[in-house]
Structures are given as structure tokens and as C-alpha cells.
């Protein structure tokens, strides 16, 4: 398909190749595609952004920074407006086909992406697995959160970021999440089918993108 497009309008310039996520298991049965997915506190942060920041006409990385600071402060204080863990079971198939599973547990923050770097230079994935999807899970009640989380954002976990303390990062080629609730996929909010139907995240691509200057 993309070769066909190139014959009529070849891409030139700063070309980047990226995988995208293919997501199934939504309540409406639709297949979706995106590069960033999150649930748990991501949902509370999204609602705060829509209600308090975007409604005032603020946008761009400045608004994202405001939302991040307010959300992290709410999580540190365990403010119930932001501190609402979502119970999720995880199954990750890595690049070699081996599967890692985690039983259902309250997840304070769960994010997945095919991008190594997110907005504001955030790099929340530190798994060593060679796989197209990064997945990071922070459990509800994660210890030393105020000291650990800044290093999580940088992708260079400090000594507080351990599985025992409630922090874990994976690399996967296929991910299954089982939970009843909502998630954010590139800004679109939707509900999972729940029950016995997993939310399945796979990859398509790589696809070429022309970077805007």
C-alpha cells in the first residue's frame, strides 16, 4: 500500500519508521490503532485535562506539563480524584515468543506504547527485551512513589524502582490485558469488553512517517 502511495507522491525529507499498536477487545467491538495507551491514573489525568485545562483553551506541551505536575502531586498525596487503581491481569509475549503473566492486581498506572520517547521527553520504559511495544505497570500502593516516579519518567529507574516495591516494565510483541474499565488510546477514550474478553495489543508496520519541521 505504501509503495503504491510512493509511486504517486514519494516521501522525502526526515522519514521515521514506527510500529503502531492494533487494539482489539473494546466494548463496541471496533478495532483501533494508536501509539500510546494508558489506564488507571491516566484516565483521571485525562478527565482533569479536559475539564480544567483544555476547556480554558490551553494546549501543547505546556498544558501537558501542567496536567502531569497536578496529577503526580495528586498521586503523591493519594488524592482520590487521581488515586484510583484499576484491577488488571497482564500477559506479555516477548519478541522470542516466551510469555510472562501477572495475576490481577490494582494498577495505579499502566501505559503501553510503540514510542520510546513520549511528550516532554518522558521515557517510561526500561525493560531490556527487544520488542516493539513497551509496557510499564505501577501497582496501587507502590512504595517510595515520590522518590521513584521521577526516575521512572526518565526511563532510568533508581534503587526504589523494583518489582517488590510495585514497579515493573516489559517489552512485548503481543500483550493481553484483562480488566473492566476505560482506557485512553491516543486521546480517544473507550471501554473494554471486560469479562472473558481480553484487550489484545499487537503491532502493525513498521510504517513510515514524515517528520514535520
Protein language model annotation of sequence segments:
Residues 94-104, 121-213:
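ATP/nucleoside-binding phosphotransfer catalytic cores, i.e., glycine-rich phosphate-binding loops
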Residues 24, 38-39, 93, 113-115, ...:
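Structured loops at beta-to-helix junctions and adjacent beta-edge loops in soluble globular domains
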Residues 28-32, 83-87, 102-108, 113, ...:
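Short gly/pro-enriched beta-turn/loop segments at secondary-structure junctions
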Residues 33, 72-82, 117-123, 142-153:
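Short N-terminal helix-initiation segments at or just after the protein's N-terminus
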Residues 1-106:
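Catalytic core of DAGKc-family lipid kinases
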Residues 38, 42, 109-124, 184, ...:
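Glycine-rich phosphate/pyrophosphate-binding beta-alpha loops
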Residues 33-35, 109, 150, 182:
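Short, flexible coil/turn micro-motifs enriched in small/turn-prone residues
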Amino acid at each position: 500500500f505504501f509503495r503504491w502511495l510512493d509511486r504517486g507522491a514519494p516521501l522525502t525529507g526526515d522519514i521515521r519508521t514506527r510500529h503502531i499498536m492494533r487494539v482489539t477487545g473494546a466494548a463496541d467491538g471496533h478495532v483501533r490503532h494508536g501509539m500510546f495507551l494508558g489506564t488507571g491514573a491516566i484516565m483521571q489525568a485525562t478527565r482533569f485535562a479536559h475539564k480544567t485545562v483544555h476547556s480554558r483553551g490551553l494546549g501543547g506541551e505546556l498544558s501537558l506539563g501542567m496536567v502531569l505536575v497536578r496529577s503526580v502531586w495528586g498521586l503523591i498525596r493519594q488524592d482520590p480524584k487521581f488515586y484510583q487503581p484499576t484491577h488488571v491481569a497482564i500477559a506479555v509475549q516477548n519478541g522470542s515468543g516466551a510469555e510472562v503473566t501477572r495475576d490481577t492486581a490494582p494498577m495505579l498506572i499502566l501505559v503501553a506504547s510503540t514510542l520510546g520517547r513520549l511528550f516532554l521527553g518522558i521515557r517510561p520504559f526500561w525493560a531490556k527485551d527487544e520488542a516493539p511495544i513497551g509496557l510499564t505497570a505501577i501497582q496501587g500502593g507502590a512504595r517510595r512513589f515520590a522518590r521513584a516516579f521521577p526516575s521512572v519518567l526518565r526511563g532510568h529507574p533508581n534503587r526504589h524502582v523494583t518489582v517488590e516495591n510495585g514497579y515493573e516494565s516489559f517489552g512485548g510483541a503481543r500483550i493481553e490485558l484483562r480488566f473492566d474499565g476505560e482506557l485512553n488510546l491516543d486521546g480517544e477514550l473507550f471501554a473494554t469488553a471486560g469479562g472473558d474478553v481480553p484487550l489484545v495489543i499487537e503491532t502493525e508496520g513498521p510504517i513510515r512517517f514524515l517528520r514535520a519541521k
